[in-house]
Amino acid sequence: PEIEKLVVGLRDQGRIIYICTNGVFMRKKMRDYLASVYDEAWEPKLKLLHTESLIDEKDLVFIRSGKPSKSKVIAPSEWLYWNVHVDGLEYTHDLIVEREGVFKECVAAIRMAKIIGYQVATNTTVYKETDVSEIEDMFAYLSSLEVDGHTISPGYDYDAAKKDMVKRLGKQPEDFFMTRQMTREKFARIQEWGEKFTIFGTPVYQEFLSGKRELRCSAWAIPTRNIQGWKAPCYQMTDGHYNGYQEMLNKVDWDRYGVVNGFARDSRCENCMVHCGYDPSGALGVDAEFGDTWKNVRYNFGPKPQPYHEGAEVQAFNGCSINKGHLAGARQAVNEPLESVITGEQEPAASFSSKGTSDVVL
């Protein structure tokens, strides 16, 4: 409930902000902003938003009322990104988040944000069951929406995630999360993706993910702060909290963590390759190799990939939008004739590719 105040405070400190979101309340926050700044100059964009079904008549009335205070809204800024969680195209993403319609809302929120003038990034986690070709199609589709960049990271079986997986989904972590070797196989083409799409992550980190080099973790470089204080040693693992960042730096024995020369100093670190630990290593020159500095300079200041308009051809809405969501499949199973259950005769299941076609599998 205090996210707006937090964002305004961080902006006053001159910080770059990524608002990580599942997209569900994003359009509401942007309507609040529009109401806070409304004047007649906004009418062309309001008309476009309404024509594109991104706001409705009720929203127009609210926006034109001009009620919210400017100090309590999230305004566009060159220092701020909406960072929308998207783990695949419609069928896959809705399945992972266990709620149909979320992908559609994410896309609507992204489109609305770009019309208003926000910067938008996406955040994707790759799991053992992730179809890499679908991730490429997802990037292509999102690029056609002129998303500004993408963060992508391997799923890692840290303690909180493992407990949630068992409790919420009834799945064993080893069936969902990846080993280091699996991560390298999934990310083998990440540098090719970076040529076509704007991938947020240093070239050195991308080489690490694809198995072309090793890096040591710099967990202290992207720290986590929550209501209990500075969390150590990292976002995934909690061995303690500290009142100040310097106190955390001084008191944590950083040599106890990470993987060095193939040896996991802490067993919890064994399969971790996530960006919050290793991406800063690429930026700071940890385990530096000849040419790394030039790679980073080119990445930060060189030309960026242009929007991939061909991505609009991807059939992104391949789930509940065409009545083939996971809940539709469950309803079909429940409503099957009793005879089919007794005889074992069933309609063949369908698997859906990222292009929206259906392949029959027996």
Functional labels for PLM-detected ranges:
Residues K231-L362:
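Flexible mid-to-C-terminal extensions adjoining Fe-S/redox cofactors in radical SAM and related proteins
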Residues E2-I3, K29-M30, E134-M138:
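Residues at alpha-helix caps and immediate loop-helix transition turns in enzyme cores, especially N-
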Residues G9, Q13-I16, E43-L46, H50-E52, ...:
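Radical SAM enzyme [4Fe-4S]-AdoMet core and its adjacent flexible, acidic
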Residues E2-L10:
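N-terminal active-site wall of soluble small-molecule enzyme domains
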Residues P1, N22, S153-Y156, G277-Y278:
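Short, solvent-exposed turn/loop segments enriched in Gly/Ser/Thr/Pro and often Arg
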Residues N22-D56:
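Internal, charge-rich low-complexity segments
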Residues A35, D39, I63-R64, K72-I74, ...:
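Ligand-binding grooves and catalytic loops that recognize ribose/phosphate and carbohydrate rings
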